[in-house]
Amino acid sequence: MTTTTPIFADVIKQHNKNVKVFPNAINPEEKQYAVAKNPRTDKLRVGIICGSSHLKDLELLSGIATQVNKDKVQFVLCGFDTRGTRTIYKDNGEVETRPIYPQESVWCDYEKIFTDNYRTISPEHKDFLMKYMAGVDDPFTNEPYRRMWTRHINDYATHYQNVDVLIAPLKENDFNKVKSELKEIECGFTHTAFIGQNFGAYTINLVPMIEKGGKINEEGTALLVDSSKNHKQWAKYINKLADDADMLKKLQDNLYNFVKDRYSLAEICKQRVEFYKSIVNKE
């Protein structure tokens, strides 16, 4: 069997000892990973790039919209989507399915977290957001929040054009523990800094630039948040990067240099071929 992390491999080995780890990888020559970042305003663009199943993870950030300096920070929620259906079970036993209303989308729940229920943005911006103009990226580029709609899978990584640092909170549970470090890899190849949960795959090989006690490690590749400090450390690190352009750049460069060869699709495919050949030769 093959899997993507040594953490997941240890779980699988409880049932099958023959496990080989091949991490997720990226082809840097793919067009969506080869685009430069859009020019930024005077705000640090803090990205949230995830799917529709992360509400419990993002709820760890409740209150963050009022903890960061909104004059220096912009949250960019990428992947916004209002598609979906709702099933209604009637008293007479009939079952009815209907398209959801835009405001019923889980993405609106995400949005409320990063706007303090729309209190941190201007009335004009809120009016625009409430129109739910699907596919029209948010033109309010200098507000404390920006909405970016879902994109085709072949253009997914272009979201990173509008992100300086990605945040990846994870609620501690068995499912999240065995996830791969894909977000870390995406950030590296797109020259994006990374703030992640000090849990699961992000503990495999990331080196925190801010160590316990506040010591700075110039070789660090990320900022990692302890689960016991979810209530304050996310905002602390975001505000730090908003004030420290040198640290932001160093994190972006260090992570890129760490992933560019280690997680290249060509390199991982080469490892796969060599492994499969070794199996054939044994037989």
Regions found by a protein language model. Give the residues of each.
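Short loop/helix-cap segments at secondary-structure boundaries that form the rim of catalytic
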Residues: 10-15, 87-90, 203-207
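Donor nucleotide-sugar binding/catalytic pocket of nucleotide-sugar-dependent glycosyltransferases
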Residues: 1-33
